Swiss-Prot record:
One of the GO biological process terms: peptidyl-arginine methylation
Domain (SAM-dependent MTase PRMT-type) ranges: 308-615
InterPro entries: Arg_MeTrfase, Arg_MeTrfase_PRMT5, PRMT5, PRMT5_C, PRMT5_TIM, SAM-dependent_MTases_sf
Catalytic activity: L-arginyl-[protein] + 2 S-adenosyl-L-methionine = N(omega),N(omega)'-dimethyl-L-arginyl-[protein] + 2 S-adenosyl-L-homocysteine + 2 H(+)
Activity regulation (record text): Activity is increased by EGF, HGF, FGF1 or FGF2 treatments, and slightly decreased by NGF treatment.
Entry protein name: Protein arginine N-methyltransferase 5
Native species: Macaca fascicularis
Catalytic site: 435 (proton donor/acceptor), 444 (proton donor/acceptor)
Region (Dimerization) residue spans: 488-494
N-acetylalanine: residues bearing it: 2
Family of this protein: Belongs to the class I-like SAM-binding methyltransferase superfamily. Protein arginine N-methyltransferase family.
Residues that bind S-adenosyl-L-methionine: 324, 333-334, 392, 419-420
Protein's UniProt keywords contain Nucleus: yes
């Protein structure tokens, strides 16, 4: 029937649905809608005017069928092409008890019939402040039966009453709600999903009106689990040729929604009557084809969006060949290392000494040899002589290094199979080069490794990198909170998954404030007593009502002088994909009001066998201290 179905957004094609309030002949309508190019149909499960009475006789026992037969469509069509809609008269949060009780019964009847049909999704309206009973009825429905429908909450981007043009200017308006204006509808949603305990089955169908809110409100919505965007035909403008188009502001919003792979639902009558209705859909296709192309980082990260991974522990574990292979493909990292080594060699060896001064260069953690090759290229580029040691503790990777030496490098490179902290070097190094950084800079124990190796660095020797700093930023993300919650393991503390960091390509999230520096390490470390434990307090101003789910971690490093690498969004090295950000979750989401400050405390702790992080929020409210004593997560020395 249709090329794609509900939940089928992906690839370059826009996935779209048609929203109708009345469907007399379902099979014919579905055929017509598919012909126009739509993938699914949103329609009431029951006739909108067929109000049922569940409480009082005699209407309670009205004869005849309650709604159309399921036999009108095949099971597969119900499963993939129809999104159910709740009858508009159903108001489970009515203050009138009879209406409320009747609505509850009718809502359950419609939800149960939707489950019986196997509908992939059901559309329910959120159009007022108090939706508590709606949340209870829906949550009870989700927890009974074995159905798997998604529930799309239809939320307006801007509340309809805020668009009324009959309000007299400067006249006092009566606001009964705690939040007004742009904040209102997000608070409806936030309170509703909190009541539903962040159920993964409940998502947003965001209705976009002619007026758009400010950018920070849109940014916040894009951190929510938006599965569909509802576009009324009335928001489309008309171009010179009579076709429907959207304003520049709306286009920018559509581009951002396309990145989240939402499905689009067109609602309303044809406002461009001389054109076919499918022209609305064709315009969305046009926008999809003409959106900015993905950059190298986005292409590499495709498929990893919001996918949680445990951080690597290359000190404790030996990496696999494929892991090395992925990192070696990074086009930026090794060219920056080569540039840093090149500059360092020129700085250490004057032109007149280039034939006599041989610099001893040690690659610590050589892996399969990319830094050795970068060093050799740098020496050639600088026209300087070097003697190279490639030190690697992974015996499997050493095999690759020895093959390189035999086939390419020759006597210029000495391969050493040893842990750099235990190696007794035959001579001291002029330059030590390493790539031991993780997504949070020091989380793969670069400080401990380089401190253990610096005794064979000359007093005037150079470490590349010379310095690195971790950064933290507060984020809101329903998606990531639910992903972490789902990581619960059978034999562990039920909240252990919230006490460990995850490497993740952040996608469906909202950053609440700019990243701030956390811990800095410098090499060589000339302190008489080296201590890599740290404690920092960071305060983040927040300009919007929101909810805190955790902290994104990034890093910047100075390789040598002005040669840097960064995954901090503001300074991200273009095209570099070796590191995704790190996520530090918190156990309980924390509501944050506009103008409040988020205060977080971070500790880096260690003993003789391991290193770990602890963290706690202390404003606007206090959280528990996460991961005390490293009980849920440590990094092995």
């Amino acid at each position: 029937m249709a090329a794609m179905a509900v939940g089928g957004a992906g690839g370059s094609r826009v996935s779209s649905g048609r929203d109708l309030n009345c469907v007399p002949e379902i099979a014919d309508t579905l055929g017509a809608v598919a012909k126009q190019g739509f993938d699914f149909l949103c329609m009431p499960v029951f006739h909108p005017r067929f109000k049922r009475e569940s409480i009082q006789e005699p209407a309670k026992n009205r004869p005849g069928p309650q709604t159309r037969s399921d036999l009108l469509l095949s099971g597969r069509d119900w499963n993939t092409l129809i999104v159910g809609k709740l009858s508009p008269w159903i108001r489970p949060d009515s203050k009138v008890e009879k209406i409320r009780r009747n609505s509850e019964a009718a809502m359950l009847q419609e939800l149960n019939f939707g489950a019986y049909l196997g509908l992939p999704a059901f559309l329910l309206p959120l159009n007022q402040e108090d939706n508590t009973n709606l949340a209870r009825v829906l949550t009870n429905h989700i927890h009974t039966g074995h159905h798997s429908s998604m529930f799309w909450m239809r939320v307006p981007l801007v509340a309809p009453e805020d668009l009324r043009d009959d309000i007299i200017e400067n006249a006092p308006t009566t606001h009964t709600e705690e939040y007004s204006g742009e904040e209102k509808t997000w608070m409806w949603w936030h309170n509703f999903r909190t009541l539903c305990d962040y159920s993964k089955r409940i998502a947003v169908a965001l209705e976009i009106g002619a007026d758009l809110p400010s950018n920070h409100v849109i940014d916040r919505w894009l951190g929510e689990p938006i599965k569909a965007a509802i576009l009324p035909t009335s928001i489309f403008l008309t171009n010179k040729k009579g076709f429907p188009v959207l304003s520049k502001m709306h286009q920018r919003l559509i581009f951002r929604l396309l990145k989240l792979e939402v499905q689009f639902i067109i609602t309303g009558t044809n406002h461009h009557s001389e054109k076919e209705f499918c022209s609305y859909l064709q315009y969305l296709e046009y926008l999809s084809q003409n959106r900015p192309p993905p950059n190298a980082y986005e292409l590499f990260a495709k498929g990893y969006e919001d996918y949680l991974q445990s951080p690597l522990q290359p000190l404790m574990d030996n990496l696999e060949s494929q892991t090395y292979e992925v990192f070696e493909k990074d086009p930026i990292k090794y060219s920056q290392y080569q540039q840093a080594i090149y500059k360092c060699l020129l700085g250490r060896v004057p032109e007149e000494e280039k034939d006599t001064n041989v610099q001893v260069l040690m690659v610590l953690g050589a892996g399969r040899g990319p830094l050795v090759n970068a060093s050799l290229r740098a020496a050639k580029q600088a026209d300087r002589r070097i003697k190279l040691y490639a030190v690697e503790k992974n015996p499997n990777a050493v095999v690759t290094l020895e093959n390189w030496q035999f086939e390419e490098w020759g006597s210029q490179v000495t391969v050493v199979s040893s842990d750099m902290r235990e190696w007794v070097a035959p001579e001291k190094a002029d330059i030590i080069v390493s790539e031991l950084l993780g997504s949070f800079a020091d989380n793969e124990l670069s400080p401990e490794c380089l401190d253990g190796a610096q005794h064979f660095l000359k007093d005037d020797g150079v470490s590349i990198p010379g310095e690195y700093t971790s950064f933290l930023a507060p984020i809101s993300s329903s998606k990531l909170y639910n992903e972490v919650r789902a990581c619960r393991e059978k034999d562990r503390d039920p909240e252990a998954q919230f006490e460990m960091p995850y490497v993740v390509r952040l996608h469906n999230f909202h950053q609440l404030s700019a990243p701030q520096p956390c811990f800095t390490f410098s090499h060589p470390n000339r302190d008489p007593m080296i201590d890599n434990n740290r404690y920092c307090t960071l305060e983040f101003p927040v300009e919007v009502n929101t909810v805190l789910h955790g902290f994104a971690g990034y890093f910047e490093t100075v390789l040598y002088q002005d040669i840097t690498l960064s995954i901090r969004p503001e300074t991200h090295s273009p095209g570099m994909f070796s590191w995704f950000p790190i996520l530090f979750p918190i156990k309980q989401p924390i509501t944050v009001r506009e103008g409040q400050t988020i205060c977080v405390r971070f500790w880096r702790c260690s003993n003789s066998k391991k290193v770990w992080y602890e963290w706690a929020v202390t404003a606007p409210v206090c959280s528990a201290i996460h991961n005390p004593t490293g009980r849920s997560y440590t990094i092995g020395l």
